[in-house]
Amino acid sequence: MESAEIARRWLAFFEKRDHVVVPSTPLVADDPELLFVVAGMQPFKPYFRGDAPAPWPRATSVQKVLRTPDIDEVGKTTRHATFFHMCGNFSFGDYFKETAIPLAWELLTTPVADGGYGFAPDRLWVTVYTDDDEAADIWHRVVGLPVDRIQRRGMADNFWSMGVPGPCGPCSEIYYDRGPEFGVGGGPVANEERYLEVWNLVFMQYERGPGGAKDNYPILGELPAKNIDTGMGLERMAAILQGVDNIYEIDTTRPILDKAAELTGQRYGSGGQNDVRLRMVADHIRAITMLVNDGVVPSNEERGYVLRRLMRRVVRAMRLLGAREPTMHELVATAIAVFTPQYPELSRNAERIFAVADGEEASFFSTLAAGTARFEAAVREAGGGVLSGEQAFVLHDTYGFPIDLTLEMAAEQGVTVDEEGFRALMAEQRRRAKEDAERRKTGAADRAAYRAAAELLGRPVEFTGYTERSGEAVVRGLLVDGAAVPAAHAGQRVEVVLDRTPFYAEGGGQLPDHGVLEFAAGRIDVDDVQQPLPGLIVHRGRVADGEITVGETVLARIDVDRRWAISRSHTATHMVHKAFREFLGDTAAQAGSENAPGRFRFDFTNPSAVPPSVLGEVEERVNDLLLHDLEVTAQIMRQQEAIASGAIAMFGEKYGDQVRVISIGDWSRELCGGTHVPHTGHLGVIKIVSESSIGAGVRRIEALVGLDAYRYLAREAVLVSQLAEQLKAPADELPDRIAGMLARLRDAEKELEKLRQARLLAEAPRLAAARVDVGGLAVVAARVDGDGVDADGLRLLATDLRQRLGGSAVVVLAGVAGGRPVVVAAVGSEALARGVKAGELVGVAAKRLGGGGGGRPDFAQGGGTNPAAVDDAVSAALDAVRAQVG
């Protein structure tokens, strides 16, 4: 019975018994206490706790679930998985044990022809909580289960909770006896490999408190009603009904496992560590595909870290299995094909899923080999003892190894890791990074000098720039080369602290004001303004004339044109942010920005590239609002009041109790301390010029505003006019005209490539005739020259020769393509049986070329950096064949 049919029967059975079918929620938990959905009941948690009234008295679902506490056991046992489906039926104060137990028994034992799962009653066992006599009595008296197949267990096994504060209760688990071939008898208390848990009935009636161990945690009291929460693992049920040994061999997992075996040249079922790795890869790929589909992207924190860890475990496992090229794309494609019938959105989101998976694999693949070598060297240094925290830190910082991966690899080698030392170094790195960022903002002076200046000032610098463009101020401090001085003279770089200023200090993505500080004897040209400490604004510049002294009065005057240009950019950023939220949803949250004169960039969260059509809609939306000349206003209010009014706060930003809210008409409201124009009409025009990725799940647009945008559009118009003249076509026909030219060019290139390959394949008869007999094998080891030589051409020629020479063929070809040497090897079935492997031959040849390579036993490819060694590489490969079979 296919997994989809098992799920369909589940939902149909309970729907007929007045349960409402509820679709699965995404894996991302809407729960502050959990990263992911870890149980089928989790979406219903508020109803169990009485926090909200249940919309229905009964419900049923097939819920996607992700659990990683037992990640190290995945692939090693027959039952552990990270991603799986939990079939559940739920009662919110409607029925309890007396109904839940018979319903479960009915579905399990009803014949397949009648819509059930057709379990033989004598193969089923149950466990109940130690003192749950009521459940035991129902199993025996109502269902008719013999007493000797009802076993009792303690809190650790038969009292269920999610592991965090929330609903909990005693449970009764149903087990299937797979037979004596899976081990000793005696029921689930004796052997959980033979007796496989298929269904857990939780009698949800208590509230769990925080803390405590799995077998002893606090119970705060009873829930408002007695509820039922049951969970049947779809994958475990499929293993039983499909007659396979474990959950990795069912219809929704085995295709992925087989693809991993195919990509690595392995054969599943031979036992040993490779089987474990193949099972682990199959499981993790399922989880990866579903996580990315549900919006998770790789990162170093929380959900993203879990995804990254899963991905990097797959990459490493595939490499250990023999893969030398990226494989994630094909593995994920297999998972998408498997699950699309149940989840059509996978097909729609395929390109986004591929992009995330391929990008993360490429990132890790580039450092994996070097990182593994570094790890092995560290293990040798440890001498079977402890891998230092410093070594683990280097693996993390330089090679991208999550600490969990290092711990796993170390355990395989029988080595422990100094985790405490590693975490101390990580904390130190974060501290230094924070200080470096602050130092970049603070310039030459250290923080002690700034603290002294702030203490001397005695109060925050008064910022007048929201309403003033110039004004008198008193010099309260001067710093030269990081030290406080009483005066600074012409030619010196100086940092000036004033008691009040119209200059805006860089912050919130807005670049600082420029301008001048004029005094009786001269002036200072200000080219940077920073706020190294809260309330302390520092003006940096060069004394152009005269000598400035502490206590002197200056006229602080900003560059008004620059301020206006930056303000236009800042207002434009707010508008673009709001428009992206309109077209992409609230997930398009601001992740950073830079507002400069005439241009701005805006970073926002989004799992994939924004389609050009959406960029066009965003651009049209904001420019339309410029024509409406909306008023831009600022208002100071309490933070809670601002958020309640709908104002958007930037994620990760810290705000005080009093905040400044910028409103653009009634359309946009954001918390912001920057400067803005009074009306949107002042912006003129906004033009988005690019959209790109700056990290997993984060996109960046670059845009122009005002005259800069106009000049860009004018240049574009000139270019279009020139192209139209060159191609003798109207502007609106240019895309089709250019597309036609490119198509013809591609066709010509394909024909040229065919001619090159044909010329190269014409060498096959000559090379075949020149074969060498080595122990009965037909060996062609040759250098190939000509303008058709490249990796593709050599692969075609090697394949052709192998077909010509039959099972005894051993073909090694090398040449120079684009100044770099390439080597390929192809081996026939008879030669394979005699121990000749293409990967080993390529390895020998590539070593002479100063490089490396790999592939399948019957076909492999490599390269190097030394084209002068091609002949030597071919000879070395021939010698290797002779050594093997000669």
From Swiss-Prot:
Binds 1 zinc ion per subunit. It is an enzyme of class 6 (ligase). Its main location: cytoplasm. InterPro entries: aa-tRNA-synth_II/BPL/LPL, Ala-tRNA-lgiase_IIc, Ala-tRNA-ligase_IIc_anticod-bd, Ala-tRNA-synth_IIc_core, Ala-tRNA-synth_IIc_N, Ala-tRNA_ligase, Ala_tRNA_ligase_euk/bac, DHHA1_dom. GO terms for cellular component: cytosol. It is found in: Cytoplasm. The keyword Oxidoreductase does not apply. Pfam families: DHHA1 (PF02272), tRNA-synt_2c (PF01411), tRNA_SAD (PF07973). Keywords: Aminoacyl-tRNA synthetase, ATP-binding, Cytoplasm, Ligase, Metal-binding, Nucleotide-binding, Protein biosynthesis, RNA-binding, tRNA-binding, Zinc. GO terms for biological process: alanyl-tRNA aminoacylation. GO terms for molecular function: alanine-tRNA ligase activity; aminoacyl-tRNA deacylase activity; ATP binding; tRNA binding; zinc ion binding. Its EC number is 6.1.1.7. Zn(2+) binds at residues 570, 574, 672, 676. Its cofactor is Zn(2+). It catalyses: tRNA(Ala) + L-alanine + ATP = L-alanyl-tRNA(Ala) + AMP + diphosphate. The keyword Zinc-finger does not apply. Catalyzes the attachment of alanine to tRNA(Ala) in a two-step reaction: alanine is first activated by ATP to form Ala-AMP and then transferred to the acceptor end of tRNA(Ala). Also edits incorrectly charged Ser-tRNA(Ala) and Gly-tRNA(Ala) via its editing domain. Belongs to the class-II aminoacyl-tRNA synthetase family. Consists of three domains; the N-terminal catalytic domain, the editing domain and the C-terminal C-Ala domain. The editing domain removes incorrectly charged amino acids, while the C-Ala domain, along with tRNA(Ala), serves as a bridge to cooperatively bring together the editing and aminoacylation centers thus stimulating deacylation of misacylated tRNAs. This is Alanine--tRNA ligase. It comes from Acidothermus cellulolyticus (strain ATCC 43068 / DSM 8971 / 11B). The lineage of its organism: Bacteria, Bacillati, Actinomycetota, Actinomycetes, Acidothermales.
